[in-house]
């Protein structure tokens, strides 16, 4: 059956390319949720053009990591991350990096698969300079405090109520029409006492 393998691969690739285009839609998470649900959170520069693997239909970007905030244990003995991987098509949530500034730093929160960093359109990837000082504080130090006990619970429609004392209602989208509202830019869901989490200002935690 070996002679048919190239043909089969070609057919699969053709079906992939001619499939109806469907926009990938997702709601961006609160930065704390992105931090807690990611295996690896780093600051890095995109320094290379994307390279597409025609076999896996994934593309990779060469990056230069400047800081790691989460993932030391998950990464194991690997000292550095040199590439980030994503689906090669936007219709299946592939991330396309549009900035041509190779000196610009980005906050990248992604998943590790077989030791490789993977991201999608739905991943938290943002220019470091676009983050508020409170968000930078969160990624650097504070978000991790709420990962085990607390959950940011999106409130997208009324009525909306807490399902647990450890949940914090996230109303940015409902009240401000954007996931980048006040709670996202300035607050973290952190333990107040055993069994209770509340929104707390990251400003007051800044040195």
UniProtKB/Swiss-Prot annotation:
Modification(s) after translation: The activity of TIMP1 is dependent on the presence of disulfide bonds. N-glycosylated.
Chief location of this protein within or outside the cell: secreted
GO BP terms: cellular response to UV-A; connective tissue replacement involved in inflammatory response wound healing; negative regulation of catalytic activity; negative regulation of endopeptidase activity; negative regulation of membrane protein ectodomain proteolysis; negative regulation of trophoblast cell migration; positive regulation of cell population proliferation; regulation of integrin-mediated signaling pathway
Subcellular location: Secreted
Entries under Pfam families matching the protein: TIMP
Key words of the record: Disulfide bond, Glycoprotein, Growth factor, Metal-binding, Metalloenzyme inhibitor, Metalloprotease inhibitor, Phosphoprotein, Protease inhibitor, Secreted, Signal, Zinc
Residue numbers bearing the Phosphoserine modification: 178
Site (Involved in metalloproteinase-binding): 37
Record's signal peptide: 1-23
UniProt KW Protein biosynthesis keyword: no
Disulfide bonds: 24-93, 26-122, 36-147, 150-197, 155-160, 168-189
NTR domain sequence ranges: 24-147
CDD domains cross-referenced by the UniProt entry: NTR_TIMP
Residue sites binding Zn(2+) per the record: 24
GO cellular component, one term: extracellular matrix
PANTHER family to which the protein is assigned, alphabetical: METALLOPROTEASE INHIBITOR (PTHR11844), METALLOPROTEINASE INHIBITOR 1 (PTHR11844:SF20)
Function: Metalloproteinase inhibitor that functions by forming one to one complexes with target metalloproteinases, such as collagenases, and irreversibly inactivates them by binding to their catalytic zinc cofactor. Acts on MMP1, MMP2, MMP3, MMP7, MMP8, MMP9, MMP10, MMP11, MMP12, MMP13 and MMP16. Does not act on MMP14. Also functions as a growth factor that regulates cell differentiation, migration and cell death and activates cellular signaling cascades via CD63 and ITGB1. Plays a role in integrin signaling.
Assembly with partners or alone: Interacts with MMP1, MMP3, MMP10 and MMP13, but has only very low affinity for MMP14. Interacts with CD63; identified in a complex with CD63 and ITGB1.
Protein name (record): Metalloproteinase inhibitor 1
């Amino acid at each position: 059956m070996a002679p048919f393998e190239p043909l089969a691969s070609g057919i699969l690739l053709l079906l992939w390319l001619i499939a109806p285009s469907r926009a990938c839609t997702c709601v961006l998470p609160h930065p704390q949720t992105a931090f807690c649900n990611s295996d690896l959170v780093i600051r890095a520069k995109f320094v290379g053009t994307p390279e597409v693997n025609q076999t896996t239909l994934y593309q990779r970007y060469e990056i230069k990591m400047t800081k790691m905030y989460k993932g030391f244990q998950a990464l194991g003995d690997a000292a550095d991350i040199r590439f980030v991987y994503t689906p090669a098509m936007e219709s299946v949530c592939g991330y396309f990096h549009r900035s041509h500034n190779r000196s610009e730093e980005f906050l990248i929160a992604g998943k590790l698969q077989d030791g490789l960093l993977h991201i999608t359109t739905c991943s938290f990837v943002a220019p470091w300079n676009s983050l508020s000082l409170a968000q930078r504080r969160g990624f650097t130090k504070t978000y991790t405090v709420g990962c085990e006990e607390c959950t940011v619970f999106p409130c997208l429609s009324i009525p909306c109520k807490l399902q647990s004392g450890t949940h914090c209602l996230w109303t940015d989208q409902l009240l401000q029409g954007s996931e980048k509202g006040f709670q996202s830019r300035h607050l973290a869901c952190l333990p107040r006492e055993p069994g209770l989490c509340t929104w707390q200002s990251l400003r007051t935690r800044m040195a």
